[in-house]
């Protein structure tokens, strides 16, 4: 069974900008290890001769004509925005990184 280390979980948490306690690191390492084990078990299933599918039932897609209706101008769309720059919404920076 594959094993993911506590350090690997800590690395993933850091990349995801998550602050995890020692208990959470241990618990998530165990849970991720279980998930990887389940995926490995599924990969072992003999699927020769089975045609690939996206869904077990036949699904029909209903098509309709694409009709252009009245749309907003850029000015109308941005009219109520608190901050705009070059016809774009200005939002607060989330991750603290700069370009």
From Swiss-Prot:
* EC number, UniProt record: 6.3.5.-
What keywords are assigned to this protein? Answer: ATP-binding, Ligase, Nucleotide-binding, Protein biosynthesis
Q: Which reaction does it catalyse?
A: L-glutamyl-tRNA(Gln) + L-glutamine + ATP + H2O = L-glutaminyl-tRNA(Gln) + L-glutamate + ADP + phosphate + H(+); L-aspartyl-tRNA(Asn) + L-glutamine + ATP + H2O = L-asparaginyl-tRNA(Asn) + L-glutamate + ADP + phosphate + 2 H(+)
Q: Which InterPro entries match?
A: Asp/Glu-ADT_sf_sub_c (IPR036113), GatC (IPR003837)
**GO molecular-function term, one example from the UniProt record:** asparaginyl-tRNA synthase (glutamine-hydrolyzing) activity
Q: Which Pfam families match?
A: GatC (PF02686)
What HAMAP family is this protein classified in?
GatC
Q: Oligomeric state and partners?
A: Heterotrimer of A, B and C subunits.
Enumerate the NCBIfam families for this protein: gatC (TIGR00135)
Q: What is this protein called?
A: Aspartyl/glutamyl-tRNA(Asn/Gln) amidotransferase subunit C
Q: Which gene encodes it?
A: gatC
């Amino acid at each position: 069974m594959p094993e993911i280390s506590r350090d690997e979980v800590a690395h993933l948490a850091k990349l995801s900008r998550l602050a995890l306690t020692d208990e959470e690191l241990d618990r998530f390492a165990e849970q991720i290890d279980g998930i990887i084990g389940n995926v490995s078990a599924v990969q072992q299933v003999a699927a020769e001769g089975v045609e690939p599918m996206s869904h077990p039932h036949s699904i029909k897609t209903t098509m309709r004509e694409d009709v252009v209706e009245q749309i907003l101008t850029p000015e109308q769309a941005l009219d109520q925005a608190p901050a705009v720059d070059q016809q774009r919404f200005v939002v607060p920076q989330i991750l603290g990184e700069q370009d």
